[in-house]
Regions:
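Predominantly soluble domains enriched in secretory-pathway, periplasmic, or organellar proteins
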Residues: 1-220
Length: 220
C-alpha cells in the first residue's frame, strides 16, 4: 500500500496494489469518498502539478492517468516493451514520466500526451525510480545489485551516466530532493540452490538481522 497527497483537492490517494484499486480519502472528514477501479494490479504512483495522478498498471504494461478532480481514469497509455513496470517518477518542469521496468528498460513518457519519448537501458529487476529536480538526474534501483543513473539534458534528451554497485535485492529507494542523497535498503543474501535462477524472489534468501541502509550522495 502506498499513500499520495494530490493537489488541488487535498484528497489522499491510497494505492491498493494487488486489487488494482485506488481509495480516495478526504482528510478533513476522515472518510473514504471514492474508490477507483483500474482493473488489475497497480504499482507506483506520482502526482503531477496539473491535478493528475499517474500510476503504473503492471500486468497491462501501461500508465493510467487519474483526474483527481473527478476521481476518474481519463487515459490509458501503453508502455512499449516494458515488462512489469514498477518504479515511476516525474519531472514537473518538463512534464516527463520515468517508468522503470523489470526487463532492463526505463521508458520516458510525455505526461501530457502519453507519447513515449525515450527508452534507456538500466539494470535488471527494477522496483523503484526517482528524479532529482535540482540536478536533473533519474535513478533506477535494481534487484541485480545496481543503481542506474541517467542525466536529463532536455525534455527529450537523456544520457546514461553510471551503473553504481549496491547490493543484490536493493530495490527499494527514497530520495531527499534537497540534498540529493539517495537511500536504499538491503540485507545480506545467500543463494538457494534449489530455486530456479530466474526466480529471483526465492533464489536469494535474506539473512535475518542483516538489514542495511545504503546511501549515495551526489557529486559535488
Amino acid at each position: 500500500m502506498r499513500v499520495y497527497p494530490a493537489a488541488p483537492t487535498g484528497h489522499v490517494f491510497v494505492v491498493d496494489g494487488d486489487p488494482g484499486k485506488l481509495t480516495v480519502i478526504d482528510p478533513k472528514s476522515d472518510s473514504a469518498v471514492a474508490t477507483i477501479d483500474a482493473g488489475s494490479k497497480l504499482e507506483t504512483a506520482v502526482v503531477g502539478g496539473n491535478g493528475k495522478l499517474y500510476v503504473n498498471r503492471e500486468q497491462k504494461q501501461e500508465i493510467v492517468r487519474v483526474d483527481t478532480a473527478t476521481n476518474e481514469i481519463d487515459a490509458h497509455w501503453p508502455i512499449p516493451n516494458c515488462s512489469s513496470p514498477h518504479g515511476l517518477a516525474i519531472d514537473l518542469e518538463t512534464h516527463r514520466l520515468f517508468s522503470s521496468c523489470e526487463n532492463n528498460l526505463l521508458v520516458v513518457v510525455d505526461a501530457d500526451t502519453g507519447t513515449t519519448v525515450a527508452t534507456l537501458p538500466i539494470g535488471a529487476r527494477s522496483d523503484a525510480a526517482a528524479f532529482d529536480p535540482k540536478r536533473k538526474l533519474v535513478f533506477s534501483s535494481n534487484g541485480d545489485g545496481t543503481l542506474s543513473v541517467i542525466a536529463e539534458k532536455g525534455a527529450n534528451s537523456f544520457v546514461t551516466l553510471a551503473s553504481v554497485a549496491t547490493k543484490v535485492g536493493a530495490r527499494t529507494m527514497a530520495l531527499d530532493p534537497e540534498s540529493g542523497r539517495l537511500y536504499l535498503v538491503a540485507g545480506d543474501t545467500t543463494i538457494n540452490p534449489s530455486a530456479d535462477p530466474s526466480d529471483f524472489r526465492h533464489r536469494y534468501v535474506v539473512t535475518p538481522g542483516s538489514a542495511k541502509l545504503l546511501f549515495l550522495d551526489p557529486m559535488p
